[in-house]
Amino acid sequence: MNLKVGIIADRLNRVLTGVGTYVYHLVRELSKIEDISLITYQDPSLPFDVPTVIKNPFGVFSNHSLYLWHLYVNGALHRTTEFDIIHSPENAALITPVACKKVITIHDLILYLFPHYAGLIHRVRYRMLLPWTVKTADRIIAVSQSTKRDLVTRVGVPQHKITVIYPGVGPEFRPCNLNTIKEMREKYHLCNPFILYTGTLAPHKNVSTLVTSFKRLKDSGMPHSLVITGVKGWRYHSVFETIRRLHLEKDVVFPGYIPYEDLPSIYSAADLYVYPSLYEGFGLPVVEAMACGCPVVASNVSSLPEVVGDAGVLATPAVDELATSMQEVLSNEGLRGELSRKGLERASKFTWEKTAAETKKVYEELV
């Protein structure tokens, strides 16, 4: 049976962050399956392109009009009957009835559970659309058991409607050799040993707490820098205010957005990766770090214990607890080696091929 699947993929029209990475790799792996025909709704002129996929039959709006773009695509899908499945893999609502089965991937419920982490218009729109989205979907893919629990207990979605499918990590995420690491250090001017954080600068990512914990380490004589990469999100200014207040301008390094191809080398070069988030639906950067052999300290909240298992140190995402865990790992070479080995083994369980195969199974169950 040849399945015709339409995938709403406007995340490929922007800088790739966690959800965009999921969409990109899901589309790439599904496109390799012979009995699935894909059409994605994206801008084919941008770099995140999958050559074997038909793209963009309905046109593209600017990044500043993505909400209108969703309405436009929804209207177009309402009129078409060419698909067996329409899949929205990025929390986006399919708000009009369509003549085929609808699948949606829910990555997290951050704006539903913690509405103060977004602006008024965005959070009102999300809280209005999410209940309708999950009600009208034929199947919901949750990226973790934690996200599934949130959907069941907080939104009232029936358990039988939800399938948990973990995201993956690509084979490009592996420990890099010394020459590659040296080139990366020179490119981004990273001379000192360093602790790494990658991700959006947003309130729920708790980066200001990480900076304050790092200050405790500097006061104890640790030689490390703190390297913070990623895009500036909502209310990112608080991170820079914390750095100035603690006089850490020379110790906290912002190389900016790191291109995808450079991520493995920066993970490989770090002595420690820290993920202090207050809430995650999955936590893909943690798996990427483990896949590169970097020891991990992560928050003990939401999905992160599920993802990390015993392959990292889990800590309460507060200043003292994070500082203690970071100090413990950095001062114990044997522990770092153990976490590196366990992380490599743990990360190997998450592959995009597996994600795509399990997603295909969901499609087949619906038609």
Residue ranges and their predicted role:
Residues 1-367:
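Carbohydrate transferase catalytic cores enriched for Leloir-type hexosyltransferases
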